[in-house]
């Protein structure tokens, strides 16, 4: 699968302009979403097209490092100070013991939605539990791999421009199934200094043990170093802004001895659509990602010449107009793009190069293309599978690799909360069968102590056999 790179022109492809809302007082203006034909791009141009906007972390690190150092030295006091500075909230208590908190009252429809989501997410992640397998590689040589839960984990649930209780479920449920003993959930407090009731409901349902009422880099630092009230964790999960991401990056390479789930960037979607896809659905799927924030990445891959682009344009303008977060969506679309593919092979080839966080395939007989997909965080197949179902309640996890990292990282799963150990056990016969080969390899590498650890035992086995004769 490859593009026809014989033509290099970028200028002959049509430009698809979407009517989207901007932050100006003029209301709605025409906002262009750049478009390209894949068959007219060179390899280097395709490489440039799939590259995400560069994030300059140098200045962000300059801001975040002092926060991390302050939390390390001052603990809860620093967390309170930064929460007052950034969130305008004075905290009396930084961490709550979830067992001491009552389950909050929720509207019955909201509670039912969370309960259905919980059941589906639990079922999908519970099914990921693997049985222990033992292999006898040669007579008397048995090897196996066993799993153990990570003892303490930190879960970051953003507050920011939107409350995300769904993220509490996505992170806490696999931790609950894995059997993590200490589960700290960090989330910014409300203006009253309390915990968002929807987040608290999900946290209690999914077995969270502590809630850290803080967000940003200070929350990540508190979980990494530990404070008087916040347990130190061994691995930190969850999405966040650039400051949260920077804190995770810094701390995983520090004396804190903490690991993280994956690198993170702005949220993104790539939609592959042909003439059978509804313009209404295409527009809705693009906007559902664009509304996350102005830095969201939105890509539309049009297959063939039968797609009604004008209808998509009209639907985007219509739907964006009624969105409370329409300004975010507008800004995201302004730096996103459309590509035109001659067929599905070309479309999927580009998608695999782009490696999107979310991939929607809305074409005729969409299921038959699943086998060609190599790089994507999560895939949504067919006209009745909007990205929203995976974001909330289908059962798959919505904490996924972004920024092209789907080429080498997986989304959060049950395995993310486990560590694996290998175990081997040899009988006398096993060492007699395997030992000479090990001794030879150790000798080649010049590691005499390794060799001796085997040969001393082999001599004892030989002596024992001689005595019994």
UniProtKB/Swiss-Prot annotation:
GO biological process terms on file: L-histidine biosynthetic process
Cofactor(s) required, per the database record: Zn(2+)
Pathways involved: Amino-acid biosynthesis; L-histidine biosynthesis; L-histidine from 5-phospho-alpha-D-ribose 1-diphosphate: step 9/9
Record-annotated membrane-spanning stretches: none
Binding site for substrate: 267, 289, 292, 358, 391, 445, 450
UniProt keyword annotation of Lipid biosynthesis present: no
UniProt: NAD(+) binding residues: 156, 218, 241
Cofactor note: Binds 1 zinc ion per subunit.
UniProt transit peptide range: 1-31
EC number: 1.1.1.23
Any one GO molecular-function label of the UniProt entry: histidinol dehydrogenase activity
CC per GO annotation: chloroplast stroma; cytosol
Enzyme class, spelled out: oxidoreductase
InterPro entries: Ald_DH/histidinol_DH (IPR016161), Histidinol_DH_CS (IPR001692), Histidinol_DH_monofunct (IPR022695), Hstdl_DH (IPR012131)
Chain's role: Catalyzes the sequential NAD-dependent oxidations of L-histidinol to L-histidinaldehyde and then to L-histidine.
Alphabetical list of NCBIfam families matching this protein: hisD
HAMAP family, per database record: HisD (MF_01024)
Family, similarity comment: Belongs to the histidinol dehydrogenase family.
Name this polypeptide is given: Histidinol dehydrogenase, chloroplastic
Species assigned in the record: Brassica oleracea var. capitata
Lineage: Eukaryota, Viridiplantae, Streptophyta, Embryophyta, Tracheophyta
């Amino acid at each position: 699968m490859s593009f026809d790179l014989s033509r290099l022109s970028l200028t002959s492809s049509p430009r698809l302009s979407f009517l989207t809302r901007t932050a100006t007082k003029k209301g709605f203006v025409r906002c262009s979403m750049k478009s390209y034909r894949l068959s007219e791009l060179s390899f280097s141009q395709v490489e440039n097209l799939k590259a995400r906007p560069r994030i300059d972390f140098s200045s962000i690190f300059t801001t975040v490092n002092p926060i991390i150092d302050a939390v390390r030295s001052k603990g809860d006091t620093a967390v309170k100070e930064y929460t007052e500075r950034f969130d305008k909230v004075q905290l009396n208590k930084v961490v709550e013991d979830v067992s001491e908190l009552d389950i909050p009252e929720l509207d019955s429809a909201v509670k039912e939605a969370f309960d259905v989501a919980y059941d589906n997410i639990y079922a999908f992640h519970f099914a990921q539990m693997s049985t222990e397998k033992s292999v006898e590689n040669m007579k008397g040589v048995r090897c196996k791999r066993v799993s153990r839960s990570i003892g303490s984990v930190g879960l970051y649930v953003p507050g920011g421009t939107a409350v995300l209780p769904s993220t509490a479920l996505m992170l806490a449920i696999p931790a609950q199934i894995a059997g993590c003993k200490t589960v700290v959930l960090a989330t910014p407090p409300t203006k009253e200094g309390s915990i968002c009731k929807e987040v608290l409901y999900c946290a209690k349902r999914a077995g969270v043990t502590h809630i850290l009422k803080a967000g940003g880099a200070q929350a990540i630092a508190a979980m990494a170093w530990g404070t008087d009230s916040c347990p130190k964790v061994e691995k930190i999960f969850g999405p966040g802004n650039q400051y949260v991401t920077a804190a995770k990056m810094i701390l995983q390479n520090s004396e804190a001895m903490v690991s993280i789930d994956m690198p993170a960037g702005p949220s993104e979607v790539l939609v592959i659509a042909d003439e059978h896809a509804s313009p209404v659905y295409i527009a809705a799927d693009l906007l559902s990602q664009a509304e996350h924030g102005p830095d969201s990445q939105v890509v539309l891959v049009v297959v063939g010449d039968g797609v009604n682009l004008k209808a998509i344009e009209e639907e985007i303008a219509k739907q964006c107009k009624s969105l409370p977060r329409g300004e975010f969506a507008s800004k995201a679309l302004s730096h996103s793009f459309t590509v035109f593919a001659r067929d599905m092979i070309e479309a999927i080839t580009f998608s695999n190069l782009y490696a999107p966080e979310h991939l929607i395939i809305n074409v005729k007989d969409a299921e038959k293309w699943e086998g060609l997909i190599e790089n994507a965080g999560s895939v949504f197949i067919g006209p009745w599978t909007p990205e929203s179902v995976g974001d909330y309640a289908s059962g798959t996890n919505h904490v996924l690799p972004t920024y092209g990292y789907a080429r080498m990282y997986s989304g959060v799963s049950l395995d993310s909360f486990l560590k694996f150990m290998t175990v081997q056990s040899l009988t006398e016969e096993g060492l007699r069968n395997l030992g000479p080969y090990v001794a030879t390899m150790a000798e080649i590498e010049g590691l005499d102590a390794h060799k001796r650890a085997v040969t001393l035992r082999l001599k004892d086995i030989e002596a024992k056999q001689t005595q019994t004769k």
